[in-house]
Amino acid sequence: MYSKTLEIRGINEGEIISYLTDIGASPVAEDNTLFQGKNWTGRIDEVSFIRMFQSDIPQISLLFESTEEQTLNKVIEKFRRKTFRAGG
């Protein structure tokens, strides 16, 4: 089994759930913490907030797993494209 944990900051849980479904996953758990894709799973492990300049910034830990390394890499690439933010 191959796995990778990502820590995402600044994107709320609702958007993360939307991104997971956009890349082909369906919710498995009623509490929207476990998602199943084709030959892969994504799980929201932890949701917390960090305080910065009078704001609470969401910090979400996601665990992706697959039996195939190539599948895992493709899923993570798709997910990273969804979460990419360009600043100036």
Question: What are these model-derived regions, one by one?
Answer:
Residues 6-12, 67-68:
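Short, surface-exposed ligand-recognition loops at beta-strand->loop->(often short) alpha-helix junctions
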Residues 13, 19, 85-88:
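Conserved mixed alpha/beta catalytic, RNA-binding, or beta-rich assembly cores of soluble enzyme
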Residues 2, 7, 17-52:
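Ser/Thr-rich, low-complexity intrinsically disordered terminal regions
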